[in-house]
């Protein structure tokens, strides 16, 4: 599987990243298949090769979470709102009972 990920480079404490396409089993700083862009978190500078990115996404490449946010800001992907998960049985039970109360309250008001 091809992943779109950030490859770290630069000096100590002055890092910047290259956006690369690479095999999912390769190392973080290993040899990439293709370089697709650049991101500097200090200056917020971002350069993206939009045609190459669209091609890779069309081929089924999966972006990491950090790359996904960069692509959403660049307008290449639509922003997806992920629903928050509630962990724990007690919290889930509280939510269910609250939904039931809301449903019964709306039925009685009608």
From Swiss-Prot:
Gene3D superfamilies: 3.30.1320.10. Residues 81-110 are annotated as: Disordered. Residues 81-104 have a biased composition (Basic and acidic residues). Keywords: Ribonucleoprotein, Ribosomal protein. InterPro entries: Ribosomal_bS16 (IPR000307), Ribosomal_bS16_CS (IPR020592), Ribosomal_bS16_dom_sf (IPR023803). One of its GO terms (cellular component) is cytoplasm. GO terms for biological process: translation. The keyword Flavoprotein does not apply. Signal peptide: none annotated. One of its GO terms (molecular function) is structural constituent of ribosome. Transmembrane segments: none annotated. Belongs to the bacterial ribosomal protein bS16 family. NCBIfam families: S16. HAMAP family: Ribosomal_bS16. This is Small ribosomal subunit protein bS16. The lineage of its organism: Bacteria, Bacillati, Cyanobacteriota, Cyanophyceae, Synechococcales.
